[in-house]
Amino acid sequence: MADSSREENVYLAKLAEQAERYEEMIEFMEKVAKTADVEELTVEERNLLSVAYKNVIGARRASWRIISSIEQKEESRGNEDHVNTIKEYRSKIEADLSKICDGILSLLESNLIPSASTAESKVFHLKMKGDYHRYLAEFKTGTERKEAAENTLLAYKSAQDIALAELAPTHPIRLGLALNFSVFYYEILNSPDRACNLAKQAFDEAISELDTLGEESYKDSTLIMQLLRDNLTLWTSDNADDVGDDIKEASKPESGEGQQ
């Protein structure tokens, strides 16, 4: 497999996606990414890489939330033996999460961000960098959490600077960045006002230019706008403290070319 061409690895990644073998999908797309030192990934390639990692990390994030919820219930009941067992099990999931995040962050730093030449590609990969530092911040504690949060903020701000200057307010990648950046403010930094302001500004700016939206990205853009509005409704409601699990974030790559 080491000598497989870039095209063959892309095709194998598509097969792995159809078979829902996402760990293997990552392996194939990492090979592609490591050959993209000079030439950046195509829209299709970066979306395949994103989908692969999103599925692998998503399953572990869901597992971590379930186990953490059980841990809280057992703590409230005073079941110390169970709590200790759960903590050990949770640490295994956290080790998995760390390994996955470290893998994509290393790839982004060494290959993907340096080779990105278009504004769209730069924002896509910087957003991705912010996303995976944010996933680390979700479960890390102490100085590690602080460092992960700082890295998230830096990546999202770098992406935002380019997006605001180079991408239209209706561009799905710009909207997806605003969505995930606002979730970061709300969930990680506990700044609901900043989260709401960022989400509202992105939504309002996109609404004002909706008539300029091309047919190819209309579906992607309006979907993310709906998610922004859903979060705003959630965050400004009286019972926002009780509905953390319902917060929406960009779960699919926003290609700008209608590829979900």
From Swiss-Prot:
| UniProt-annotated stretches for the region Disordered | 238-260
User: What are the annotated GO cellular component locations?
Assistant: cytoplasm
Q: Where is the composition biased (Basic and acidic residues)?
A: 245-260
Q: What SUPFAM superfamilies does the database record attribute to this sequence?
A: 14-3-3 protein
- Which domain of life, per UniProt? Eukaryota
Q: What Pfam family is a match for this entry? A: 14-3-3
Q: Which InterPro entries match?
A: 14-3-3, 14-3-3_CS, 14-3-3_dom_sf, 14-3-3_domain
| GO biological process entries | protein localization; signal transduction
Query: Subunit details for this protein?
Result: Homodimer.
Of which family is this protein a member?
A: Belongs to the 14-3-3 family.
Q: Which PANTHER family match?
A: 14-3-3 PROTEIN (PTHR18860)
What this protein is called in its record is 14-3-3 protein 4
**Taxonomic source organism:** Solanum lycopersicum (Tomato)
